[in-house]
Amino acid sequence: MFAPSRRRVLEAVASSSSSPVVTLPGFLVPAFQQTAGAAARRNFSATTTRPSKLGRTPLSIPPGVEITIGEPFVKRDMTQWKQQPKRKITVQGPLGQLEMDIPDFIKIDHDAEARRATLSVANRDEKEQREMWGTTWAYLNRFIMGVSEGHTAVLRLVGIGYRATIDTRPEKEEYPGQQFVCLKLGFSHPVEMGVPKGMKASTPQPTRILLEGINREQVMTFAADIRRWRVPEPYKGKGIFVNGETIKLKQKKIK
C-alpha cells in the first residue's frame, strides 16, 4: 500500500510517539537547569546599591560648636497614619542655637575629640532612607556654618528711584528692637517689611540690602519676600536681584 521508504518513516514516528522519555541535546541541557526560584530572585540590575555621596562624607565641626543628640520620641501628627520615631539635634555655636528633628533610622557618630560627625542609615536599600541621608547631612552642614560664621544675602535694587532704608517702627514691631526694611519701588506708597527675629538687615548703599542670620532658610525666604515686590523683568532689566542673580534681556517687538 505504501512505499517501503514511507513505511519505515511512519513506523519510526509511531515508535517515538509511544515512548514517554524525551532526551534533549547536550548543548540545551544547561539552559534548563536554572530553577524557577533563582530566576525569580534575579534583579534587573546586578550592581550594588551606591551610598549617598554627601551622606557618607564626614562633617567637620569647628571649635566653639557643639552638637547634642536627644533621645528618640514619637511626635503625634494627625496628618500621618504612620508614626515615625525622631530625634532632636541641637547645634550651638558662638552666633546662636539651632534645632532640627531627624528620623530615628539616621545614626550620627559624633567624635568630640576629632571634631567630626559621620552620618549613616539603618538600611541603604530603602529609597526613603537614602534620600533623607543626604538631606539631613545638608541641613546639619548649614546649621554648623550658620552658628559659626552665619549666612548672608545681598539684594540689588535696579531701577530709577529704587531705594532702601532700615528704620524702626515702635507701633508695628512684633518684638523689641525689630527692624523694618523700607523700600521705594515706584509705587504710590513705600513698602515696609519687618525683619524676622534672629536676623539683621543693613543698607551699605541706598540700592543694596544686606541680610544676615544663622538660619539660611530664614534668610533666603525673607530675601524672596522682598524680591517678590519687583521681580526682575526681561525688557529693561529692572527689579530686585538676589546674590548675583542675572537675567537675559529680550528685544522689544516692533510692529
UniProtKB/Swiss-Prot annotation:
Similarity comment: Belongs to the universal ribosomal protein uL6 family.
Keywords in alphabetical order: Mitochondrion, Ribonucleoprotein, Ribosomal protein
Subcellular location: Mitochondrion
Gene Ontology BP term (one): translation
Keyword Ribosomal protein recorded: yes
Keyword Ribosomal protein: yes
Function: Component of the mitochondrial ribosome (mitoribosome), a dedicated translation machinery responsible for the synthesis of mitochondrial genome-encoded proteins, including at least some of the essential transmembrane subunits of the mitochondrial respiratory chain. The mitoribosomes are attached to the mitochondrial inner membrane and translation products are cotranslationally integrated into the membrane.
Gene Ontology CC terms, in alphabetical order: mitochondrial large ribosomal subunit
GO MF annotations in UniProt: rRNA binding; structural constituent of ribosome
Region annotated Disordered, chain positions: 39-61
Main location group: mitochondrion
Name of the molecule in the record: Large ribosomal subunit protein uL6m
Subunit comment: Component of the mitochondrial large ribosomal subunit (mt-LSU). Mature N.crassa 74S mitochondrial ribosomes consist of a small (37S) and a large (54S) subunit. The 37S small subunit contains a 16S ribosomal RNA (16S mt-rRNA) and 32 different proteins. The 54S large subunit contains a 23S rRNA (23S mt-rRNA) and 42 different proteins.
